[in-house]
From Swiss-Prot:
Domain OTU: 181-327
Catalytic activity: Thiol-dependent hydrolysis of ester, thioester, amide, peptide and isopeptide bonds formed by the C-terminal Gly of ubiquitin (a 76-residue protein attached to proteins as an intracellular targeting signal)
Role description: Hydrolase that can remove conjugated ubiquitin from proteins in vitro and may therefore play an important regulatory role at the level of protein turnover by preventing degradation. Inactive cysteine protease. Deubiquitinating enzyme which regulates gene expression by contributing to chromatin organization and DNA methylation patterns (e.g. H3K4me3 and H3K27me3). Involved in the interpretation of environmental information, probably by altering chromatin organization and maintaining redox homeostasis. Required for phosphate (Pi) homeostasis (e.g.
Enzyme Commission code: 3.4.19.12
One MF term in the entry's GO annotations: cysteine-type deubiquitinase activity
GO cellular component: cytosol
Ranges of Basic residues composition bias in the record: 133-142
Active site residues per record: 189, 192, 320
Reported consequences of knocking out the gene: Altered DNA methylation of root hair-related genes and altered phosphate (Pi)-responsive root traits. Abnormal responses upon Pi starvation leading to the formation of very short root hairs instead of increased lateral root formation and increased root hair length. On low-Pi media, altered H3K4 and H3K27 trimethylation levels at the transcriptional start site of a subset of genes encoding key players in Pi homeostasis thus leading to a reduced transcription of these genes.
UniProt-recorded name of the protein: OVARIAN TUMOR DOMAIN-containing deubiquitinating enzyme 5
Organism, as annotated: Arabidopsis thaliana (Mouse-ear cress)
Keywords: Coiled coil, Hydrolase, Protease, Thiol protease, Ubl conjugation pathway
GO BP: any one term: proteolysis
């Protein structure tokens, strides 16, 4: 398996001949330093493997965790055996080596198992299953799991949004196709409602729109201010729970300022204002909700209605408006 092959490189990345030649010129201190580095690399590898194993479903995570434990156990054993042999070549002896008397030098150096533990500092999990993981190991494992869980949630949310968007678009297409209509995409920059209306006005005039999206914002805000008594009840119902930020009139004025001077997303309040400003019938198609019509009193027989589409699941950030045009008359 690929991970095993990569992990075994921690144990030895040299050929036997190269390792033998290097060890002939290696001091005990250098060897011990190398051993510590090898153990540290194995610990890091264990953390990486556990992080990778924390992804996927619970069943997949359980299977991966068991595989990681087996792999780390094998690598730990292999690394320990290698280091024991190298220690023995430097005069160290095991405490269980057939009761052979230890010479003075060996007595001072201590038995191999003790030295290996001293070199390791903090052993990898497979080597000390009987002892509790250190706080740093627990923190690393916790961070790895939290990051993996976060990535999994993001994937699930993106998948959910994508699925909802596909369903919504399919329903909208089914509604528009028999009418010979289709959606003309509008930039999702916060001005989408006003840009969609601008696009419709341009299509109806056969040239440029008489109003830019910014003009339309200012017109909507001005009309709402002039007809405050008509819009205030709807505004309050939409902003219920914001009473701590000032009086109703103050909050309504702040809302109007945002409409005319920021990229705040538009809603039915602004559409209602625009239908009167422009004296146009506006119809909003949707794949998620019933179609909405505003300004029916302005509807005429010359097919001058403005047509938009409302998308609840277009983007992860929220709602969006597009322009609806004849199939053979798509414009930017």
């Amino acid at each position: 398996m690929a991970d095993n092959k990569t992990s075994e490189g921690i144990v030895s990345e040299e050929t036997p001949m190269d390792a033998s030649q290097e060890q002939q010129h290696e001091t005990v201190e250098e060897m011990l330093a190398r051993h510590r580095q090898e153990i540290k690399q194995l610990q890091n590898k264990e953390t990486e493997m556990k992080k990778a194993a924390a992804k996927g479903s619970k069943a997949e995570q359980k299977a991966k965790k068991k595989q990681v434990e087996d792999d780390i156990s094998k690598l730990s054993t292999k690394l320990k055996d290698k280091q024991l042999k190298e220690l023995a070549s430097q005069g160290f002896s095991s405490s269980s080596s057939n009761n052979i008397a230890k010479d003075e030098t060996t007595e001072k150096k201590g038995d191999i198992d003790t030295l290996v533990r001293a070199i390791a500092g903090v052993s990898v999990t497979a080597q000390q299953e009987h002892s509790k993981p250190s706080k740093s190991v627990k923190r690393r494992e916790k961070r790895a799991k939290e990051e993996a869980d976060r990535e999994q949630r993001i994937k699930e949310e993106q998948s959910h949004v994508k699925s909802d968007r596909m369903v919504e678009n399919a329903k909208l297409e089914k509604k528009l196709k028999p009418l010979g209509l289709t959606v003309s995409e509008i930039k999702p920059d916060g001005h989408c409602l006003y840009r969609a209306v601008e696009n419709q006005l341009a299509n109806r005039s056969g040239g440029a729109s008489p109003y830019t999206y910014q003009n339309l914002r200012e017109m909507a805000a001005s009309y709402m201010r002039e007809h405050k008594t008509d819009f205030l009840p709807f505004f309050l119902s939409e902003t219920e729970g914001d009473s701590n930020s000032g009086s109703a009139e103050e909050r309504f004025e702040k809302y109007c300022r945002e409409v005319e001077s920021t990229a705040a997303w538009g809603s039915q309040l602004e559409l209602g204002a625009l239908t009167h400003c422009l004296r146009k019938h506006i119809k909003v198609y949707s794949g998620s909700f019933p179609d909405v019509e505003m300004g029916k009193e302005y509807r005429s027989g010359d097919d001058s209605s403005l047509m938009l589409s409302y998308h609840r699941h277009a983007f992860g950030l929220g709602e969006h408006y597009n322009s609806v045009v004849l199939v053979n008359n798509i414009t930017g």
